[in-house]
Amino acid sequence: MLALLLLQAPCSTAEIQTLTITSDTRPMILIEKFGFTGRGHVSISVSSVSVVAGTGSQPEPSRLGFFLLSEESLLQVLIEMQQNPNFCVLDSHYTNHLFTFRCLSPPPASSFNHTYPLILPARYSLFFANCNPESSVSMKLHTEFFTLNRDGSRNYLPSGHALLPSLFFLFSILYFSFLAFWLYLCHVSNHSLLHRIHFLMPSLLLAKALSLLFAAAVKHHANLTGISHAWDDVTFLVFDFVSVVLLFTVVVLVGTRWTFLHPLRQRGKTVLFFVVLPLQILAHVAFVVVHNTGPYIQDWVTWNQILLLLDFISCCAVVFLFLWAIRLLRRITSKAQSEPAMNLDRFRLIKRFYLVVLGYFLMTRFGVFVLRTIIAYEYEWVSNLAEETVTLVFCIVMFYMFRLVEKDEYSVLAEIVVNE
């Protein structure tokens, strides 16, 4: 369980956390993760602490407390816990002990407040441990993670996220420029070449540009104050949701040229498309829960797994749609063998686009995940750079393949389906 939490928990968006734990019986709670490369500090304040004993003896205050665990010490702690199932992690020499409940002020305050400097650069995980079986803990917790700049000001972003505000802003400018260029092409091109999909594609660019712009604002505000601005955060989530839904919509519509919406005969296949979007909506709900909470909630790991599962199913559904569209077009064009131009072997565009989409899914879902797993914590921004670069290149390739040209291969295929 410890390894699962550490692997799935990203560094927080807001590095000032205020949370309430109520009647929690978990033996270990991951509060937050943070990576330091300089003068790191962790500030912890607990209040209104109460411990309720289970069926056993009275809880021992020294068996409840907070500690920091670096990634380098994770393996050693796991070995200790495997060798002795009753081992209390607070007794481990590989953890950085902060304080136990023995340090709390007498009731009714039952509080503690202290700031700890961290000398060794590393990525740390803040844990709360309860080594009293069957006892439940309630408390109010306030944590702050920050590094001190040379002028004494605080930097609340982890070292691996320090470049994210500039990175997101740069990609936002690129998407706005791409949008302006596409609108210019639509304006100067022959309007008879415009299809409905060409009006939907710039909506994707606009939503993506705005989501990145507000993501940069969220990170910038979190870096200065330790918390994300509520308006920027909500706006980012809205535009991020719209951009994800539009991306899947455009990919499916472009990849099948709306042939799956062909009436009556293909009614059963239309259902599949209307399953993809609800799956993405549910996946985004899971993303909002993960984004706005933290690993301290009891179902946090479950929400992460739901997010990954729904996104994976959505990608598989899109790939299935493409395979079905290719089979449909092969069957339709086989009836038009009298015209050499109708031979499916000469229509390579849909096959190429299928490979492009498959490569995009593999790189953004699996490649980025592997990169985030193996990369050092101070270079976490590289995984964001890779993901945004792949997405931008994918959009450029998709827009180029289905640009405004007269009688491209895809238009001919669309006419065949409509006439059929």
Where are these regions (language model features)?
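Generic recognition of cysteine residues
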Residues: C11, C103, C131, C186, ...
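Structural signal for hydrophobic/aromatic residues that build the beta-strand cores
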Residues: I44, Y124-L126, L183, G255, ...
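Generic detector of multi-pass transmembrane helix bundles and their immediately adjacent loops
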Residues: I227-E420
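Soluble extramembrane domains flanking the early transmembrane region of eukaryotic membrane proteins
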Residues: M1-A162
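Residue-level marker of positions within ordered structural domains that often coincide
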Residues: V49, C131, V188, F260, ...
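Helix N-terminus capping/helix-initiation residues
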Residues: S70, L157-P158, H195, Q305, ...
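Hydrophobic alpha-helical transmembrane segments corresponding to the first two to three helices
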Residues: F145-L282
